[in-house]
């Protein structure tokens, strides 16, 4: 896999799975913020579309040892994204400001190579033009484009909020390249009632995620693939960390 340069700013998430209750508030907030049209039947995998999905995990043991965890899965904004490597028209790329993997919809030709290459299944193809119930079209976020039929879309870490935070910093006479912790947060971070999703700059010591992602209980999904995800998870439960990278029984798990 080709290498990618390091960025001064590295936006990322730390998601505490021991705090997540699987309520789905993050999913709803993501849909509302990013103009994702609601579907009457969410089980219809052809028509339903979610940039953020919450998965239920369990340890496979019977009661009373049975245990459950919930895992929110946004785009991992990989440091070495396989989706970028395979796109024939450069419709997806690593953003220079923060390392977010961008998606340029007018360039996308709908080949879906990026979907096939993503090990996290975090990309979605628009088979249909989006439609909204009467009145809901007036509540769309003006800074987020509505994606047409025939293109691939995904989580962007609410990049429009990043642009807004930089504009606000300029107005206040601050350096837009040195945002404070909390100046720029994603909609899912804002909506989580338990504070399970923490967002910030991994490279900034003043941001909470700077220390959290170094915890001995931190892990990343399928880390051994070498994609360098910018989303970390926390859990004190070993079985949860073991599932994160498909560890075998004899392999030692971090933490």
Curated annotation (Swiss-Prot):
Record keywords, A-Z: 3Fe-4S, 4Fe-4S, Electron transport, Iron, Iron-sulfur, Metal-binding, Oxidoreductase, Periplasm, Sulfate respiration, Transport
Top-level taxonomic group: Bacteria
Binding-site list for [3Fe-4S] cluster: 155, 158, 188, 192
Residue stretches in coiled coil: none
Occurrences of domain 4Fe-4S ferredoxin-type (ranges): 11-41, 66-97, 99-128
Signal peptide: none
Positions with a binding annotation for [4Fe-4S] cluster 2: 75, 78, 83, 87
Biological processes, Gene Ontology terms: anaerobic respiration
Co-factor binding comment: Binds 3 [4Fe-4S] cluster per subunit. Binds 1 [3Fe-4S] cluster per subunit.
Cofactor: [4Fe-4S] cluster; [3Fe-4S] cluster
Name of the top EC class for this enzyme: oxidoreductase
One MF annotation (Gene Ontology) recorded for this entry: 4 iron, 4 sulfur cluster binding
GO CC annotation terms, alphabetical: periplasmic space
Binding of [4Fe-4S] cluster 3, residues: 108, 111, 114, 118
NCBIfam families in the record: mnquin_red_QrcC
PANTHER family: PROTEIN NRFC (PTHR43177), PROTEIN NRFC HOMOLOG (PTHR43177:SF3)
Free-text function comment from the UniProt entry: Component of the respiratory Qrc complex, that catalyzes the reduction of the menaquinone pool using electrons transferred from the reduced periplasmic cytochrome c3, and which is probably involved in sulfate respiration. Is likely essential for growth on H(2) or formate since the periplasmic hydrogenases and/or formate dehydrogenases act as primary electron donors for the Qrc complex. QrcC is an electron-transferring subunit; its cubane iron sulfur clusters form a pathway for electron transfer between the hemes of QrcA and the membrane quinone pool.
Name the UniProt record assigns to this protein: Menaquinone reductase, iron-sulfur cluster-binding subunit
The species this protein was found in: Nitratidesulfovibrio vulgaris (strain ATCC 29579 / DSM 644 / CCUG 34227 / NCIMB 8303 / VKM B-1760 / Hildenborough) (Desulfovibrio vulgaris)
Gene from which the chain derives: qrcC
């Amino acid at each position: 896999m080709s290498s990618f340069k390091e960025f001064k700013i590295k936006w990322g998430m730390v998601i505490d799975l021991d705090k997540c209750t699987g309520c789905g508030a993050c999913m709803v907030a993501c849909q509302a913020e990013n103009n994702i049209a609601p579907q009457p039947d969410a089980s219809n995998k052809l028509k339903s579309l979610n940039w953020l999905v919450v998965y239920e995990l369990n340890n496979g043991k019977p009661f009373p040892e049975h245990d459950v965890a919930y895992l929110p899965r946004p785009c991992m904004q990989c440091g070495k994204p396989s989706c970028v490597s395979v796109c024939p028209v450069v419709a997806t790329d690593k953003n220079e400001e923060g390392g977010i993997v961008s998606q340029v919809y007018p360039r996308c030709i709908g080949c879906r190579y990026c979907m096939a290459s993503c090990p996290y299944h975090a990309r979605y193809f628009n088979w249909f033009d989006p439609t909204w119930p009467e009145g809901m079209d007036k509540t769309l976020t003006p800074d987020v484009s509505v994606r047409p039929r025939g293109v691939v879309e995904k989580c962007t870490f609410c990049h429009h909020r990043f642009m807004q935070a930089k504009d606000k910093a300029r107005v206040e006479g601050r350096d837009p390249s040195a945002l404070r912790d909390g100046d720029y947060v994603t909609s899912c971070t804002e909506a989580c009632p338990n504070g399970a999703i923490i967002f910030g700059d991994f490279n900034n010591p003043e941001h909470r995620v700077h220390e959290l992602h170094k915890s001995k209980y931190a892990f990343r999904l399928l880390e051994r693939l070498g994609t360098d995800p910018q989303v970390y998870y926390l859990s004190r439960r070993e079985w949860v960390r073991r599932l994160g990278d498909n560890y075998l029984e004899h392999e030692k798990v971090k933490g």
